Regions:
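Alpha-helix N-cap and loop-to-helix initiation/capping positions
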Residues: 80, 107, 167-175, 212, ...
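Conserved Radical SAM active-site core
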Residues: 24-146, 150, 159-161
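Anionic-ligand binding region
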Residues: 164-196
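Hydrophobic faces of well-ordered beta-strands that scaffold small-molecule active sites
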Residues: 52, 100, 128-130, 151-153, ...
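Alpha-helix-loop-beta-strand connector modules within alpha/beta enzyme cores
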Residues: 116-127, 178-186, 260-266
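Non-cysteine beta-strand/loop elements that form the S-adenosyl-L-methionine
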Residues: 145-160, 233-241
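Conserved radical SAM core fold
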Residues: 72, 109, 134-137, 155-173, ...
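Auxiliary Fe-S-binding modules of radical SAM enzymes
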Residues: 1-21, 189-299
Length: 299
């Protein structure tokens, strides 16, 4: 599979087993930037003690406004074996993580599934979260089938021209829509533990409002509301957009934060469409530190 890689929708077909790096910037060796408890996910995922986040190096999307550019562009990452990855999962469980949270994992899907199988054999019992961009191939998602309990996925754009401008992926809307269907097929209806309030199964769809992007965000909400399972997933509306250094020259429209009135309008619009199983962020979210230090903690 990795000899002519088609794990992501870019389908670059490089031989990652021979050491070639794909569009994702990675060859076949798993590389991590951090493995530690994280408290900034949605409440049913972070809970009280935190989510056991494992940050994988590389990404198939490369959004111009990415807050994790140091790892998405492959400049940060430490090589780990499959056996070490399995041990990292078990170590997160030992730290009382509520779940194993795989951040941008799809380009390492076969290796991750092997590590999860080894960890399960050694006592891993936590639910597994696939925390991804939404730009996912059905091939990669089907590798995760039966191994992932929760999909925490972005749905970034409904307008192809915006997807092309900011992520060089004009096919993002249709790819993400098909991926969402597959995610729901695998894990089904959103379900929290009635005793703890922690998420056990289901899909959480994140959408980040971008500056000047309200009409696109409205279109994303319409697309989600039209899904036959719309009331059986959760939507997380995010206001934490932060301008990244250097972005303002090529993309001046992204140089400022979002308009709070736009965010309020987005919340109202989603609720009017019946997307009432949803999360929203407080006004100070963009000033808070959602970006951990990629310092190889836990790796």
């Amino acid at each position: 599979m990795l000899e002519s890689c088609t794990l992501c929708p870019r389908s670059c077909k490089v031989n990652r087993l021979a050491g070639a790096a794909g569009y994702c910037t990675q060859d076949a060796t798993v590389r991590l930037a951090r493995a530690a408890l994280h408290h900034w996910e949605e409440p049913p995922i972070s809970g009280d003690t935190g989510s056991g986040t494992v940050f994988f190096s590389g990404c198939s999307l490369h959004c111009v406004y990415c807050q994790n550019q140091d790892i998405s562009n492959g400049s940060i990452g430490r090589e780990v074996s499959i056996e070490r990855l399995a041990q990292i999962f078990l170590e997160q469980q030992g730290r009382d993580a509520h779940n194993i949270n795989l951040v941008t994992p799809s380009h390492f899907a076969p290796q991750i599934v092997e590590a999860l199988s080894r960890a399960r054999a050694q006592g891993l019992k936590l639910p597994v979260v696939c925390n991804c961009s939404g730009y996912e191939s059905l091939e990669a998602l089907r590798i995760f089938d039966g191994h992932v309990d929760i999909y925490l996925t972005d749905f970034k754009y409904a307008f192809p021209e915006r997807a092309e401008r900011y992520s060089r992926a004009s096919d993002y809307p249709q790819v993400a829509s098909a991926a969402l269907d597959e995610m729901y097929r695998q894990v089904g209806e959103y379900r929290e533990d009635p005793q703890t309030g922690l998420l056990e199964k289901g899909v959480v769809v994140r959408h980040l409002l971008l500056p000047g992007g309200l009409s696109d965000s409205f279109a994303v909400m319409r697309l989600l509301a039209a899904k036959p399972y719309a009331r059986k997933i959760c939507v997380s509306l995010m206001s934490q957009y932060t301008p990244m250094p250097g972005c303002e020259q090529a993309f001046p429209e992204l140089a400022e934060g979002i308009d709070p009135q736009d965010y309020d309008a987005l919340i109202d619009y989603a609720l009017d469409l019946g997307l009432d199983n949803s999360f929203c962020q407080e006004g100070e979210a963009a000033s808070e530190s959602f970006i951990p230090a990629f310092d190889y903690e836990g790796v």
